[in-house]
Curated annotation (Swiss-Prot):
CC annotations in GO: membrane
Family according to the record: Belongs to the TMEM234 family.
Gene that encodes the chain: TMEM234
Pfam family, one: TMEM234
Sorted UniProt keywords: Membrane, Transmembrane, Transmembrane helix
InterPro entries in the cross-refs: TMEM234 (IPR018908)
Membrane topology, record value: Multi-pass membrane protein
Domain of life: Eukaryota
Claim: Membrane is one of the keywords in the record: yes
TM region positions: 1-21, 82-102, 112-132
Protein name, entry field: Transmembrane protein 234
Species this protein is from: Pongo abelii
Length: 166
């Protein structure tokens, strides 16, 4: 199934929502390290309160969940073999870009080389799913030949049966 431009853009948006929010969630959840309670139940409740009453954490979390919802909706009409590599690979790139913008160390030249190779690979996945007009014509021509061959085989088989039983 060929992916439309809208489907590809929706998957890129999902990757941006997932990858772009990860460094923000990491930074905002640093307050969890300071939470210390005597029992695991109180610890859990205090951690939930610390996270979900913190708008610095809550906004990226909600955006991340919007990405998950968009992914779910997009999967209904998109080929899974295209959706998974686009979202997962580009999410890593968006994580590195946003992390770098926030001042994190992203790993230097090797990370940049990895991002370039990832974009090239995703581009190949996307373009291989598109159907170029002349390839569609070749496919139709090939199907016609296959149908002709199939019909010929059926005629010969039915002729052989009638000779055997006739």
């Amino acid at each position: 199934m060929a992916a439309s431009l809208g489907q590809v853009l929706a998957l890129v948006l999902v990757a941006a929502l997932w990858g772009g929010t990860q460094p923000l969630l990491k930074r905002a959840s640093a307050a969890l390290q300071r939470v210390r309670e005597p029992t695991w139940v109180r610890q859990l409740l205090q951690e939930m309160q610390t996270l979900f009453l913190n708008t610095e954490y809550l906004m990226p979390f909600l955006l991340n969940q919007c990405g998950s919802l968009l992914y779910y909706l997009t999967l209904a009409s998109t080929d899974l073999t295209l959706a998974v590599p686009i979202c997962n690979s580009l999410a890593i790139i968006f994580t590195l870009i946003v992390g770098k913008a926030l001042g994190e160390d992203i790993g230097g030249k090797r990370a940049v080389a990895g991002m370039v190779l990832t974009v090239i690979g995703i581009s190949l996945c996307i373009t291989s799913s598109w159907q170029v007009p002349w390839t569609a014509e070749l496919q139709l021509h090939g199907k016609g030949q296959l149908q002709t061959l199939s019909q010929k085989c059926k005629r010969e088989a039915s002729g052989a049966q009638s000779e055997r039983f006739g």
